[in-house]
Amino acid sequence: MKKSTVLDARPTGPLPRRPQQPSPVEVRNSSQVEKNNARGSWRKLSPLGRQQEEQGGLIHSQSQSLDTSFAPNTNTTLGSTDVNLNSGVRDRPSPRHSIMHRRETRPLLPSNPTDSGVYASEDCGSSSAGFPRFSSMGNIDKSRDNGQLPDGLCTGGSEVTHSSAVHGEAITDELLRRLTRCSDLKSVSSAQFQLDFGTLRCVESISARMPQLNSLKLNNSRITELRVLGTNYANLRRLWISNCLVSSVSGVGACAPVLEELYASFNSISDIDALTEVSSTLQVVDLEGNDIRDTDMLKRTLPQLKKMKHLVLKGNPVASSETIVELSHSSEEKGTRQRKVSYSKLIGHLMPDLQYLDDAEISNTSLQKSARVQKKHHSAHVDPLEICIRDEYLFVQECIRECGFDALGASGADEMHGSCSRSNVSLISSRSHQLKQNRPSYDRNRPSVAVRSLRKNSQSTASSGDSTNQGCDGGKPRPSCQRWGPTQRTSRLFTGRVTSVGAPKARCRQLPPLKETPASPSTEGLGNEPGNDGQRQQESGAMMQLALKPVPPDANSTRGERKQQNTTSPICGLTAAKGNVYAFDVCDDDDDELEKSKESLMHRVRLGNSATSQQATFMGSGTAKSTNSELADSGLSFLLHRLSTCTHPSGADPPDQRNEQQQEQPTTAGATSRCLDDLETPGDGPLESLNGTPEKDWEWRRELMQSVVDIRKMTSEAALKERVQGSKEVDGGGLEKVESEDEEDVSPVVF
């Protein structure tokens, strides 16, 4: 058996490191370097470059292509141009560094100083696309074959410049002719220079040497301010100053007063207030990549640029997507509030006529519409949040209405109930204390009170014709005004109105339910219960017991709740009559009527036991004595005894004046007597039997008659006072002296 030897293949020492494979990027870059070395490193040109290549003189042979090496210490002479290079030799950079360096900075420069230079980079699109551009100074490599540079290049020290970049010399006609390749400078309309305005002299003379200059391109030059260009470019309409280290556009109005297009991208401009100097002509402004960050300056400057159509502000701090600007109302408006809007909306509001913003067409119709609205109202503010809240509020209101709850309708119902309630001063204990609890709920779909009353009246008329109430005018059926819901305890009152023929006419209207109020000390114990009848008679006085004839209560009336009807003729003035005749005017205001009735009843309660003495004083006056015959005729002859026992007041009229008054004017006392008779006459609209107990019915009738007598007393006193003073107007009770042409057709109003 043979022995087998097992060898240990494991390494006893550190393994050698595997060579690192080049990354795909390096392989791609290496292949690109070889490809560029084979065909030239700046062979791909823009359309303008290819056009010039076909004409010849712009692209050199491949042997003249630039080298990536740099030898600053060598001296090379190209034709008539001296190139001073240092003797030192730098190491050749890596291929990756070379290709990136060549792709970013290497320009294709013209062989002739007057030819235009064009970038050989693939990126030929910029804000000034189609126009030749120059590279920045100091970033141009030497030719790679024999250290030579293309024609038109000169370098000194470590800086390589184009021969058209003039340094340290004055601007002369010869220099301008050489740069523009035109012998007649006065006919030049466009020019392109790359100049160092820090070392050049007489730069301001360019405007005088080329007066017809229409377009001037100074990209990649060294210009700190536009003031160095001079003034009086009378025909200059387009100006390019991109990448020129410009920090201010001050003096643009003096430099180019008719400027229409300004391309000033990639500078250090932070203040654009000077653009307002050319606001009448400026239409295009390119300020990309500057240092504009003040929104107040934009709000102050942009609205003045009325003809602006194209604006580029991207690349500035103010145009950042996170930037939020604050707007406020004009200083003239009160209640200033700050609101926040975005940058794009700010520009849209400040410039309503703007068509392009940041190379994008403004197509948002809502933004344009809101901007036009703000322009119309001279305000630069629209709050989208407010519009959103308004729409949501309308939607919520619509949902509430669909659910059946209408807060507006409910509040309106409460207001109606509150306005239709009145103080309970006459029938405190007789009215129910559950009026609010028994009040029907508000329903918009339910018929109105008038419609329900007419329907109920028509049904009651059809069932029994005798139960219909008869009115005072022709005996027509009068609908019973009854509220829907629980029956309210009300009263019925008829008021006569003077018509054209002199006949009284009564109308009926229901008063709203009485509102519950706490009983005052003066009205305590004034209930209408049968047990309080004696107490009420003592308070009313002996004169009222004689003046008021008892009305027998209706035997057929049952205990129940009374209804109330009232006319629209409150006691608020006097009706016209010939001479000095006073009568009550007719008004249709229920509120005034209610207040008058309440005041008359409260006046009776406050007087109390003194009513007898006041009535005796009135009956002893001259006016009352002159009406003895009328009182006897009207059935109130029992009052003559009181008239004979009363003495004359000190201020009474003399007998002659009283006789004259008796002849000219039918007295109010006579009207009072006729009123009492009319209340008892069945044919002229009597008080109907109330739906209550006989005692309560009689009590209510007595109170009504008492109020009529008190009102007539007040009227007589006012008439007497007017006669004594001899004036045409009386300040008491709203009385007015009027005259009428026909005494026979007008008679006092009868209640």
UniProtKB/Swiss-Prot annotation:
Superkingdom field: Eukaryota
Family of the protein in this entry: Belongs to the LRRC56 family.
Basic and acidic residues biased stretches: 717-738
UniProt GO BP: cell projection organization
Any one GO cellular component localisation term in the record: ciliary membrane
Compartment annotation: Cell projection, Cilium, Flagellum
Observed effect of gene inactivation: Gene knockout results in significant reduction of flagellar beating and cell swimming, and absence of outer dynein arms in the distal region of flagellum axoneme. Cell motility is characterized by an erratic swimming pattern with altered propagation of the tip-to-base wave, increased frequency of base-to-tip waves, and frequent tumbling typical of outer dynein arm mutants.
Ranges of biased composition (kind: Pro residues): 13-22
Classification via PANTHER family: LEUCINE-RICH REPEAT-CONTAINING PROTEIN 56
Intervals holding LRR repeats: 210-235, 236-256, 258-279, 280-304, 307-328
Polar residues bias spans: 28-39, 60-87, 456-471, 662-671
Gene3D superfamilies: Ribonuclease Inhibitor (3.80.10.10)
Keywords: Cell projection, Cilium, Cilium biogenesis/degradation, Flagellum, Leucine-rich repeat, Repeat
InterPro entries: Leu-rich_rpt, LRR_dom_sf, LRRC56
Biased segments, Acidic residues type: 739-751
Protein name: Leucine-rich repeat-containing protein 56 homolog
Entry keyword Repeat: yes
